[in-house]
């Protein structure tokens, strides 16, 4: 399938929620997500949380990769609660802000189901332009990029915070 272009913040957020619902329906074992802060993702949206809850099960893993999670903790309290409850299937890592990300997508969501892969990429956050693709080659290249970046990251966004 050829990549389908999209434009607009609302369209990007709609496609994110639809891709999460698709991943749940397809029984995807892994979901990979990249964004500098995830602040513009509809993580506390009821439909997104329902899709994630439906998806989260034995043997499932959500890999989050960001530069920081402070914005998520401040703006997406419902997702933070979900993260706490489903910590067993979430791995969150952070890359150093100084790390060069030349050519990196602004946002990336990857999943593979029985019907094949889905790759959702946002290239321009200013104009909210991106593409969604079912191309296996695009997914492989994006996953290799994600894995290379994850190797230069550290654990972050713990499911619970311990206080004194």
What label would you give each PLM region?
Residues 1-30, 37-164:
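PLD/PLD-like phosphodiesterase catalytic module centered on the HKD motif
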């Amino acid at each position: 399938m050829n990549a389908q272009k999209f434009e607009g913040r609302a369209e990007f957020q709609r496609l994110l929620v639809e891709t999460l619902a698709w991943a749940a329906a397809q029984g995807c074992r892994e979901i990979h997500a990249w964004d500098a802060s995830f602040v513009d993702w509809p993580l506390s949206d009821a439909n997104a949380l329902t899709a994630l809850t439906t998806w989260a099960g034995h043997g499932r893993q959500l890999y989050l990769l960001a530069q920081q999670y402070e914005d998520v903790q401040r703006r997406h309290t419902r997702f933070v609660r979900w993260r706490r409850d489903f910590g067993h299937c979430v791995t969150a890592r952070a890359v150093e802000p100084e790390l060069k990300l030349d050519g990196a997508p602004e946002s990336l969501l990857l999943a593979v189901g029985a019907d094949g892969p889905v790759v959702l990429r946002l290239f321009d956050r200013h104009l909210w332009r991106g593409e969604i693709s079912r191309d296996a080659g695009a997914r492989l290249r994006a996953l290799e990029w994600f894995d290379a970046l994850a190797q230069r990251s550290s654990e972050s966004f713990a499911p619970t915070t311990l206080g004194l």
